[in-house]
Amino acid sequence: MPQNTLNTVILAAGKGTRMYSQMPKVLHCIGGKPMVERVIDTAAALNPQNICVVVGHGKEQVLDTVKRDAVWVEQTEQLGTGHAVKTALPHLASEGRTLVLYGDVPLIDVETLETLLEAAGNEVGLLTDVPADPAGLGRIIRDGSGSVTAIVEEKDASATQKTIREINTGILVLPNAKLENWLNSLSSNNAQGEYYLTDLIAKAVADGIKVRPVRVRASHLAAGVNNKRQLAELERIFQTEQAQELLKAGVTLRDPARFDLRGRLKHGQDVVIDVNVVIEGEVELGDNVEIGANCVIKNAKIGANSKIAPFSHLEGCEVGENNRIGPYARLRPQAKLADNVHVGNFVEIKNAAIGKGTKANHLTYIGDAEVGSKTNFGAGTIIANYDGVHKHKTVIGDEVRIGSNCVLVAPVTLGNKVTTGAGSTITRNIEDNKLALARARQTVIEGWMRPEKDKQ
């Protein structure tokens, strides 16, 4: 039997009633990624012959959310873990081994699974744990010589068996040559009226197949999620591990306990991240980048020596070197900033290319625009890019000076070194080196008296 023929089955059909959520349990996220997706990615790292995911409750939602290359099998009736694996049998090889994983055990890692597979060889591998509180979990039964002989679920366990602290994590390696016969012989004659996958241990022993137990090196690696408290506990463990890895790699985290990584972070040297920062998706930070407190950075690239001030939100954007962003700035998708750009408080940029050295320091909206270098936006400048049906583009040249409280009504083009007077509404193109004013002339009313309230 070729030991390198590996099939994986991921059980993800449960309702998750204790989550009190309309979302299928396995779609709840750890580190910004659905739990079942994490398990699929871990399984894929083992290079198996196939990955079979058994779904049931919320099947359509799971399939719509998780875009991974796998065989998806529906368990129409939730009749237990043994029945779930049985539904996957038509997709498993007749030779080799099957690794059984769970869509709600998100932190299982490749190292643990490789150790289990090596220990199992061509026999049965069983991942066990000795948690602080084994209540509610299946107990490992051993004979006088210490060999595993069975697993007893707590609802079926005797008072003596309940004192056993070693528990079954549910993760198994099973020989395919025996698997079908074992599954077909399962009985639902138990406290829950279900077909237990754990009953295969006793069947293996009866057939003379050795059960090779491997104790997980840390309980959280095999911990399942049944409620929001457990989800939060694993999330915090995951985030702590991510923070520790970043610290080892030279990133300065002002408070590792107040940092969330919900994706992947690529970074240079001397990166500093302040408290309550959230990193999502694919993020790249260059050398000497500083991220201020309470920022959210999602799918963004930030060049060397740039500083992001507190409470800024960057998503789907590219920031050049030596930029100064924020506080309270928002860069939306397709915002692309060259080097030495300043974006100040309450400035929003969307789908716009901003040239080198340009500044928008206060209260400005720049959308669907192409802006040259060394241009300055006065406070309160608005690019009116939407006519109610379509978005239109604005082109602004180099060294343009836009006065405070101006509105640029797209589509419109401002040439190089144009100046607009404060309070102007610009609706027509302006040639290079021109001053444009588009506002009512001030009138002072002589002899005017301010109305006063009647004192009676």
UniProtKB/Swiss-Prot annotation:
Name of the protein this chain belongs to: Bifunctional protein GlmU
The cofactors it requires, by name, are: Mg(2+)
Quaternary structure and interacting proteins, as annotated: Homotrimer.
Which EC number(s) does UniProt give?
Answer: 2.7.7.23, 2.3.1.157
UniProt organism field? Neisseria gonorrhoeae (strain ATCC 700825 / FA 1090)
Q: Which PANTHER family match?
A: BIFUNCTIONAL PROTEIN GLMU (PTHR43584:SF3), NUCLEOTIDYL TRANSFERASE (PTHR43584)
Source lineage: Bacteria, Pseudomonadati, Pseudomonadota, Betaproteobacteria, Neisseriales
UniProt-annotated binding residues for UDP-N-acetyl-alpha-D-glucosamine: 11-14, 25, 75, 80-81, 102-104, 138, 153, 168, 226, 332, 350, 365, 376
Cofactor note text = Binds 1 Mg(2+) ion per subunit.
Ranges for the region named Linker are: 229-249
Q: Which GO terms describe its cellular component?
A: cytoplasm; membrane
NCBIfam families named among the record's database cross-references: glmU
